[in-house]
């Protein structure tokens, strides 16, 4: 069970960090 919870936690953090990285890269390219 703990492994499943940590896996979902990893997916949650990845789904929030990845878009932030893409937004940061797009802002850098605009400048």
Swiss-Prot record:
Protein name: Cytochrome b6-f complex subunit 6
Electron transport is among the record's keywords: yes
Transmembrane region(s): 4-26
Keyword match RNA-binding: no
Chief localisation class: plastid
Sequence similarity: Belongs to the PetL family.
GO cellular component terms attached to this protein's record: chloroplast thylakoid membrane; cytochrome b6f complex
Membrane topology value: Single-pass membrane protein
Species annotation: Nymphaea alba (White water-lily)
GO molecular function: electron transporter, transferring electrons within cytochrome b6/f complex of photosystem II activity
